[in-house]
């Protein structure tokens, strides 16, 4: 036997790694072997590692003493090529012993602390005699108090580079310093082993004053089996038979555990016990979080543009339209669908929808401001810029104004009918009854247009049905005169009615009587005011939405009227109107009501004349609107 040591004597010269020989076949050169190369597999039960080492086998020798167990410096040699492969004898009840005793390993300045054994030394013949390739621990006499357990250090990360340390293996025929990592065998042959290198420092005395184990940590890697990878002793031994090199493992009377690989900064209780912590799931990369929809086309929109949450496409379209002052024409009936798929079909309807949802044209930089990212020119700030903390107070007036303009343009006839237009003396041809019937027909057509127009005013449909009907019937004559005055070319005696019919003044004189001259004068005065379309839209809405006798909820009607007035004031305050329009609109309302009184007088006269019985709807409207 090449190494024999006494129990309490220093190690003989032949037991050190510098003079260790085995026969005459091996040299005594000192080398630094490469540490084990690890092949890691992530499994569902934990982290398994397949280790292949460059030494074929290693062994320690010990002497049997019934009352002492002390680890001596390792004497390692190489097995002859013809010798049998070392096997590993597993402990059959190591899980129970592991749970009953908490063992800690303190690795500091290249030494180990003394531990109390958890199982008495082997006494049976089967447990006492093991192959020469096994490692034994025997209890040392309790000359000094045992050192209390220290918390284990966190295991080195797999990414850390293993430092070089002097080894105690003599190269021989079976040892190749350039040996490559052996590919992993079958899943059953993989052995979960954790290697923790020791820094190349000389041993230091125990910090607690106790004797440390006489085991050189640079001689071999510290081995530890996690509990999660433990299995029956027989199956483990059979699985390890196919390993390229036999790895001796001592009976686990004292366990040196290392925390397994974890993804957290500090080891948890489960990692200290060798259990595999649950791996965190990858973050959920949801593409729809935090995004809204475009108010114009319904596409994805991340932020607001020009006061409204819109997509990049509608933002660019609106900006180009405003900067170029482009004018679009709808080839259909001005109600084309605007969505993600069909938003490029009609530019007119797309731009009108941009305005209706509240996009502000004044926010778009003009040609003189293109490319500037600084401050806008100093001018009176709009309420939108002065009070950004509020939820956008000017938005309701802007939305109301756009809706009123859209309602007025929709009520305008698209095609003019000149089929009955006759400016000569033949215009007076026909009987009086025919002219009166024509007068009634034009009034009836105006009622239908007024009803569809009123339903497009924001907030009107929220009123009670009774109030809606009362407001429309009370203002039908005012709306009739106002639309006729806006569309007609009274300077040439051309009157354009709600259904698109164009008649000369002489063609209408026998049915309208003197009321037609009052309408012509009002039209000339209104057109001389140079009101823009926004002011005309507000004038039309205010002529209907006003205080009337018999309303069920007059407060709500008053609130709606105030919103329309605020829209007109806001339009004037921004300087968009050519001239101050609010006083002109109020004066026009007063004149309009006077003209409507003359219209009621004309209907009353035709009823008395009784040439043609009026339609039921005209008769009812006449009776409901009488001031007495």
From Swiss-Prot:
Zinc-finger ranges (NR C4-type): 294-314, 330-354
Keyword Zinc-finger: yes
Region (Disordered), start-end ranges: 96-163, 269-290, 366-396
Location of region: Activation function (AF)-1 domain: 1-112
GO biological process, one term: positive regulation of vascular associated smooth muscle cell proliferation
Biased composition (Low complexity): 270-289, 379-389
Keywords (A to Z) from UniProt: DNA-binding, Metal-binding, Nucleus, Receptor, Transcription, Transcription regulation, Zinc, Zinc-finger
Location of region: Required for DNA-PK heterotrimer: 1-140
Subcellular location: Nucleus
Statement: the UniProt record of this protein carries the keyword Zinc: yes
DNA-binding region: 291-366
Biased composition (Pro residues): 142-151
Post-translational modifications reported in the UniProt record: Phosphorylated by PRKDC.
Region (Interaction with KAT2B): 381-628
Tissues/organs with expression: Expressed at high levels in cultured apoptotic neuronal cells and fetal brain, and at low level in adult brain.
Family label: Belongs to the nuclear hormone receptor family. NR4 subfamily.
Subunit relationships: Interacts with SIX3 (via homeobox); differentially regulates the transcriptional activities of NR4A3. Interacts with NR3C1 (via nuclear receptor DNA-binding domain); the interactions represses transcription activity of NR4A3 on the POMC promoter Nur response element (NurRE). Interacts with TRIM28; the interactions potentiates NR4A3 activity on NurRE promoter. Binds DNA as a monomer and homodimer. Interacts with PARP1; activates PARP1 by improving acetylation of PARP1 and suppressing the interaction between PARP1 and SIRT1.
Domain description: The AF-1 domain mediates transcription activation. The N-terminal region (1-292) directly interacts with the C-terminal LBD (380-627): the interaction is potentiated by AF-1-mediated recruitment of NCOA2.
Protein name stated in the entry: Nuclear receptor subfamily 4 group A member 3
């Amino acid at each position: 036997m090449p190494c024999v040591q006494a129990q309490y004597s220093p190690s003989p010269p032949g037991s050190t790694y510098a003079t260790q020989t085995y026969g005459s076949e091996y040299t005594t050169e000192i080398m630094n072997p490469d540490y084990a190369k690890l092949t890691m597999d992530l499994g569902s039960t934990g982290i398994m590692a397949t280790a292949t080492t460059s030494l074929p086998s290693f062994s320690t020798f010990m002497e049997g003493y019934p009352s002492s167990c002390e680890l001596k410096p390792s004497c390692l040699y190489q097995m002859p090529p013809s010798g049998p492969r070392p096997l590993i004898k597993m402990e059959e009840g190591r899980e129970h012993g592991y749970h009953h005793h908490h063992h800690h390993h303190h690795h500091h300045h290249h030494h180990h602390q003394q531990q109390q054994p958890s199982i008495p030394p082997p006494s049976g013949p089967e447990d006492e005699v093991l192959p020469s390739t096994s490692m034994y621990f025997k209890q040392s006499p309790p000359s000094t108090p045992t050192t209390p357990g220290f918390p284990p250090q966190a295991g080195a990360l797999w990414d850390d580079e293993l430092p070089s340390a002097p080894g105690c293996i003599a190269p021989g025929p079976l040892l190749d310093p350039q040996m490559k990592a052996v590919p992993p065998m079958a899943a059953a042959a993989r052995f979960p082993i954790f290697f923790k290198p020791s820094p190349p420092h000389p041993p230091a005395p125990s910090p607690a004053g106790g004797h440390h184990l006489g085991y050189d940590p640079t001689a071999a890697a510290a081995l530890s089996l996690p509990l999660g990878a433990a299995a029956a002793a027989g199956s483990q031994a059979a699985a390890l038979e196919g390993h390229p090199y036999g790895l001796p493992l001592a009976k686990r009377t004292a366990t040196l555990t290392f925390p397994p690989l974890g993804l957290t900064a500090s080891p948890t209780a489960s990692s200290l016990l060798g259990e595999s912590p649950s791996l965190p799931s990858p973050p959920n990369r949801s593409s729809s979080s935090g995004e809204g929809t475009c108010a114009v086309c319904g596409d994805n929109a991340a932020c607001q543009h020009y006061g409204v949450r819109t997509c990049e496409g509608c933002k660019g379209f609106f900006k180009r339209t405003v900067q170029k002052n482009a004018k679009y024409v709808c080839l259909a009936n001005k109600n084309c669908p605007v969505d993600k798929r069909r938003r490029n079909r009609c530019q007119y309807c797309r731009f009108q929808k941009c305005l209706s949802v509240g996009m502000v044209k004044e926010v778009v930089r003009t040609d003189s401001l293109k490319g500037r990212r600084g401050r806008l020119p100093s001018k009176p700030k709009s309420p939108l810029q002065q009070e950004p903390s509020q939820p956008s107070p000017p938005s309701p007036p802007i939305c109301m104004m756009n809706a009123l303009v859209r309602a007025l343009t929709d009520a305008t006839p698209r095609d003019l009918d000149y089929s009955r237009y006759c400016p000569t003396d033949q215009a007076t041809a026909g009987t009086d009854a025919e002219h009166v019937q024509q007068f009634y027909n034009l009034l009836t057509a105006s009622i239908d247009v007024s009803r569809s127009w009123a339903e497009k005013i924001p907030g009107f449909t929220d009123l009670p049905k009774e109030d809606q009907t009362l407001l429309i019937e009370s203002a039908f004559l005012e709306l009739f005169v106002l639309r006729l005055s806006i569309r007609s070319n009274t300077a040439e005696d051309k009157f354009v009615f709600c259904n698109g019919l164009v008649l000369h003044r002489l063609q209408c004189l026998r049915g309208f009587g003197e009321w037609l001259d009052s309408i012509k004068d009002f039209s000339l005065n209104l057109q001389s005011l140079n009101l823009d379309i926004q002011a005309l839209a507000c004038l039309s809405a205010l002529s209907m939405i006003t205080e009337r006798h018999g309303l069920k909820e007059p407060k709500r009607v008053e609130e709606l009227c105030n919103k329309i007035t605020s829209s007109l004031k806001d339009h004037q305050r921004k300087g968009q109107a050519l001239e101050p329009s609010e006083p002109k609109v109020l004066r026009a309302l007063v004149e309009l009501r006077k003209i409507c009184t003359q219209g009621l007088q004309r209907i009353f006269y035709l009823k008395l004349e009784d040439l043609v019985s009026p339609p039921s709807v005209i008769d009812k409207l006449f009776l409901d609107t009488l001031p007495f």
